[in-house]
UniProtKB/Swiss-Prot annotation:
It comes from Halalkalibacterium halodurans (strain ATCC BAA-125 / DSM 18197 / FERM 7344 / JCM 9153 / C-125) (Bacillus halodurans). Its EC number is 3.4.21.92. Keywords: Cytoplasm, Hydrolase, Protease, Serine protease. The active site is at S99 (nucleophile), H124. Pfam families: CLP_protease (PF00574). GO terms for biological process: protein quality control for misfolded or incompletely synthesized proteins. It catalyses: Hydrolysis of proteins to small peptides in the presence of ATP and magnesium. alpha-casein is the usual test substrate. In the absence of ATP, only oligopeptides shorter than five residues are hydrolyzed (such as succinyl-Leu-Tyr-|-NHMec, and Leu-Tyr-Leu-|-Tyr-Trp, in which cleavage of the -Tyr-|-Leu- and -Tyr-|-Trp bonds also occurs). InterPro entries: ClpP, ClpP/crotonase-like_dom_sf, ClpP/TepA, ClpP_His_AS. This is ATP-dependent Clp protease proteolytic subunit 2. Fourteen ClpP subunits assemble into 2 heptameric rings which stack back to back to give a disk-like structure with a central cavity, resembling the structure of eukaryotic proteasomes.
Length: 194
């Protein structure tokens, strides 16, 4: 969300109010993930989800995603919050949902996960690097394998694909069109309008 942020001006009666576009979207219960997932982005998304739940726990939330993915720990903070809050969460891929962003796309409420027609979705196994003594490398490798297993389990449970198929598909970058993501079970529908 770095760079230029547009502002909108709303008029009511004799007064005007200026909002940055993200704050204005939040008024309509729309959250936009449009960057790589790091701790700062995750904390912002989590805060917005918690705010919207506190404001009205019975009203749906809309999470629009256009992201290359990012940190698994930051991603799981968003994922767990999505499962924790009471409102149904519609997920909508606009552009790309890659890596952990694809996990967030499939984390939406079943029946309410969408992709726009030209969206691209990509799943893969986690990656990481380490240096140091052999014992340090073993600890890091064990952690990454554990994260991989969690990602396989979540993807399998939420798509209906077997864990074996998901593990095989995640072995390398596995790109899907919107139609392929629909067949895979990552999204429930391809949409062209609201």
């Amino acid at each position: 969300m770095n760079g230029y942020v547009p502002y909108v001006i709303e008029q009511s009666g004799l007064s005007e109010r200026s909002y940055d576009i993200y704050s204005r979207l939040l008024k309509d219960r729309i959250v936009f993930l449009g960057a790589a997932i790091d701790d700062q982005i995750a904390n912002s998304i989590v805060a917005q989800l918690l705010f919207l739940e506190a404001e009205n726990p019975k009203k749906d939330i809309y999470l629009y995603i256009n992201s290359p993915g990012g940190s698994t720990s930051a991603g799981f903070a968003i994922y767990d919050t999505m499962q924790f809050v009471k409102p149904s969460i519609h997920t909508i891929c606009t552009g790309m949902a890659a890596s952990f962003a694809a996990i967030l796309l499939l984390a939406g409420t079943k029946g309410k996960r969408f992709a726009l027609p030209n969206s691209e979705i990509m799943i893969h196994q986690p990656s990481g690097g380490a240096q140091g003594q052999a014992s340090d490398l073993a600890i890091t490798a064990k952690r990454i394998l554990g994260i991989r297993e969690k990602l396989v389990t979540v993807t399998s449970e939420r798509t209906g694909q077997s864990p074996e198929k998901v593990a095989k598909d995640m072995d390398r970058d596995y790109f899907m069109s919107a139609e392929e993501a629909l067949e895979y079970g990552i999204v429930d529908q391809i949409i062209t309008s609201v």
